[in-house]
Regions:
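Short secondary-structure junctions and interdomain/linker hinges
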Residues: 17, 21-24, 40, 171, ...
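A ubiquitous structural signal for well-ordered alpha-helices
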Residues: 10-13, 17, 29-32, 54, ...
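HTH-adjacent hinge/linker in prokaryotic transcriptional regulators
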Residues: 1-25
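Residues that form generic nucleotide/phosphate-binding pockets
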Residues: 13, 17, 163, 175, ...
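Glycine-rich phosphate-binding loops that contact phosphosugars or nucleotide phosphates
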Residues: 34-169
Length: 186
C-alpha cells in the first residue's frame, strides 16, 4: 500500500459520484439553496463537520445558513423557520434519529428538503424534495481496509459551491437570485 494507491483510490471514489449525481441534480440542488430564505444544514455524528463546512462556505458566498452540532439548536432553528426555508440533511445511513426528527418538523413547517445520503432505501428519502445520492464502498482498491471517510460528502459540498458560483456557465435561461454574489468575502 503506497501513498499513490491511497490517493488514487480517493480520486476514483470521487470520480464515481458522477454515476449517481447528474448535472441536473446539482443544478436542482443549487436552485433550492439559492431560492431559500435560510438554509438549515443538519447532520449527526460524523456528518456534523460536513454540515458545518457546507454552512460556512454557503455563508461566505452570500446564502443565509444555520447549522449547529447540537440537535436542540437545529430543532429550535427549524421550529422558528417558515416554508421559504430549506433543510439540507446530511446522513450517510439515512437513519440518524435526530436528523429524522428534524425533517419531520421541517415537513410540518412545509420547508423544502435536500438530502445527501448513501442509502436510497432509507427512511430519510420519505422527506426529500431533492436527493444527492452518494454510493461508496469506502474501501481501498485490492485491500480489505475500510477508510472511515466522508470524502464524498465533502466532494458534494465542493460541487454545490462550484455550481452555485458558476451557474451562468451552464447556459440556462434560469437565473439564480443575485444575493449569492453580494457578500464581500472577508
Amino acid at each position: 500500500l503506497t501513498s499513490e494507491k491511497i490517493f488514487s483510490a480517493c480520486a476514483n471514489r470521487i470520480r464515481s459520484l458522477s454515476s449517481f449525481i447528474s448535472t441536473n441534480d446539482l443544478l436542482c440542488a443549487a436552485k433550492l439553496i439559492c431560492e431559500a430564505r435560510i438554509c438549515h444544514i443538519i447532520g449527526a455524528g460524523n456528518t456534523i463537520p460536513i454540515a458545518s463546512d457546507l454552512g460556512f462556505r454557503l455563508q461566505r458566498n452570500g446564502q443565509s445558513c444555520m447549522y449547529s452540532s447540537l440537535p436542540e439548536q437545529y430543532f429550535n432553528n427549524i421550529a422558528l423557520g417558515d416554508s421559504s426555508d430549506l433543510v439540507i440533511a446530511i446522513s450517510r445511513s439515512g437513519a440518524s434519529t435526530q436528523v429524522l426528527k428534524a425533517l419531520s418538523l421541517a415537513k410540518k413547517k412545509e420547508m423544502k428538503i435536500l438530502v445527501i445520503t448513501a442509502d436510497p432505501n432509507s427512511q430519510i428519502m420519505d422527506f426529500s424534495d431533492a436527493i444527492l445520492q452518494i454510493n461508496d464502498t469506502n474501501e481501498m482498491h485490492d485491500q480489505n481496509v475500510r477508510a472511515d471517510s466522508h470524502l464524498l460528502e465533502l466532494a458534494v459540498n465542493d460541487a454545490l459551491i462550484y455550481v452555485i458560483k458558476n451557474y451562468p456557465l451552464f447556459n440556462f435561461d434560469d437565473k439564480l437570485p443575485t444575493q449569492i454574489n453580494d457578500v464581500e468575502l472577508l
